[in-house]
């Protein structure tokens, strides 16, 4: 069994820089006045209520102004475009 005292300081979570708090006034300055969408949700509270983290997003069908900058869309490989003449070669 590992010694909890020595493993505490070798942890990545102990030595990394803390994530800064989000200043909601900066979002309002960018024109995103509806800051209720961007509030931090506690995952344990979501587990207790039985709601999935994405359930609130499904309630908002008009879309999100920052949706194109989500981590999934930003870091995924672009979809390859296949033209009709390339398809004929297959």
UniProtKB/Swiss-Prot annotation:
Hydrolase keyword on record: no
InterPro entries with a match to the protein in the record: MLLT11_fam, WRNPLPNID
An example Gene Ontology biological process: extrinsic apoptotic signaling pathway
One CC-aspect GO term: nucleoplasm
Record key words, sorted: Cytoplasm, Cytoskeleton, Nucleus, Phosphoprotein, Ubl conjugation
Subcellular localization(s) per the UniProt record: Nucleus; Cytoplasm; Cytoplasm, Cytoskeleton, Microtubule organizing center, Centrosome
PTM annotation: Ubiquitinated, leading to degradation.
Phosphoserine PTM positions: 84
Major location category of this protein: nucleus
Motif (Nuclear export signal): 24-32
Its job: Cofactor for the transcription factor TCF7. Involved in regulation of lymphoid development by driving multipotent hematopoietic progenitor cells towards a T-cell fate.
Subunit architecture: Interacts with HSPA8 and LAMP2 isoform A; the interaction may target MLLT11 for degradation via chaperone-mediated autophagy. Interacts with TCF7.
UniProt cross-references to PANTHER family, sorted A to Z: PROTEIN AF1Q
Protein family: Belongs to the MLLT11 family.
Protein name in UniProt: Protein AF1q
Organism the protein comes from: Bos taurus (Bovine)
Gene designation: MLLT11
């Amino acid at each position: 069994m590992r010694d909890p005292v020595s493993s505490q300081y070798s942890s990545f979570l102990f030595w990394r820089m803390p994530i800064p708090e989000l200043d909601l006034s900066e979002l309002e300055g960018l024109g995103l006045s509806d800051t209720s969408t961007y509030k931090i949700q506690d995952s344990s509270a979501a587990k207790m209520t039985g709601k999935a983290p994405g359930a609130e997003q499904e309630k908002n069908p008009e879309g999100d102004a920052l949706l194109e900058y989500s981590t999934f869309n930003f870091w995924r490989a672009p979809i390859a475009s296949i033209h009709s003449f390339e398809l004929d070669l297959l």
